[in-house]
UniProtKB/Swiss-Prot annotation:
Protein's organism: Pseudomonas savastanoi pv. phaseolicola (strain 1448A / Race 6) (Pseudomonas syringae pv. phaseolicola (strain 1448A / Race 6))
Protein name: Protein-glutamate methylesterase/protein-glutamine glutaminase 2
Superkingdom per UniProt: Bacteria
Keyword set includes Transmembrane helix: no
Role according to the record: Involved in chemotaxis. Part of a chemotaxis signal transduction system that modulates chemotaxis in response to various stimuli. Catalyzes the demethylation of specific methylglutamate residues introduced into the chemoreceptors (methyl-accepting chemotaxis proteins or MCP) by CheR. Also mediates the irreversible deamidation of specific glutamine residues to glutamic acid.
Amino acid sequence: MAVKVLVVDDSGFFRRRVTEILSSDPNIVVVGTATNGKEAIEQALALKPDVITMDYEMPMMDGITAVRHIMQRIPTPVLMFSSLTHEGARVTLDALDAGAVDFLPKNFEDISRNPQKVKQLLCEKINSISRSNRRSSGFGAASAASAAAPAAPTSSSRAPAPTTAPARAVPTRTAAPATAPAAHAHHAPAHPTTSGTPKRKAYKLVAIGTSTGGPVALQRVLTQLPASFPAPLVLIQHMPAAFTKAFAERLDKLCKISVKEAEDGDVLRPGLALLAPGGKQMMVDARGTVKILPGDERLNYKPCVDITFGSAAKSYGDKVLSVVLTGMGADGREGARLLKQAGSTVWAQDEASCVIYGMPMAIVKAELADAIYSLDDIGRHLVEACL
């Protein structure tokens, strides 16, 4: 069954080009277009698309307001188009808070001169978002909750961590690779327990990797951590260079722990989360120092979860607690394999709470996950495991 898409943009040129690009994919059909947020709501109610592409700056009603209304009235995955500026980043993060699932840079030059590149990225995202939404029955409730949630505060005061009801972990059987060091071999029990309480350990580092759906997921996890959280954290979110600084600033305002965009030479310390800068790679060494490297064009992801996880395995051995959250693709799987070989712990987000069950699924299918947790429980379990 073809994916039904509603295209929303006040630019006639952009609307036509996006429609042409999507229509060239045999798995996608554009069922309608809209020129502003008000029309988008009307068309969404009438056409019931599987996915909506949405501009944010439009007359009559902006994209963020439209997303909030859509999530409350007819929850539908929304892919935002955003300008690659600091202000564009701020607005895009507001849209993700409102319930949008992902975003793409709005680049008129690319869509004019390099439509094949845009087609590959846009169609891949549309198809992945649609597949994930069809698998999951929880999108509507989660999206409505996002739309009803208050916007991010503008003050720099630390926000109180939300409380969540305990939920059961679903540990998975893990086979340690044959190359794992014998002293650090990590095996799952033959009959895994269903207890929600993770094993406590003196972790020296918590490493979290994510992609599509990650901004909201990271916010949900990190706001549950106390200021006294005893381990340093490194965060790897697939995101353009113009966005990561704004995202780190937003998290810092929302969380009790401190969050900043990582810089070369930063020192890891308890209660500080360092976010990998967009367009670059982040590594950690055994002295607790962060190294920021230029993005390698041979790698699909900049930043790349595998790169950071691999450096953590080399530098900290069995003292890393890694978490793979929602995201497309399989980034993080090979890094998690190295962590497992070193004896470290790997968690994955469960399918039901993922926007895109790609990266966590890769971990689970490779039998690398020590436990699978719902998004709402990961923050609480981090506290239980590390305190």
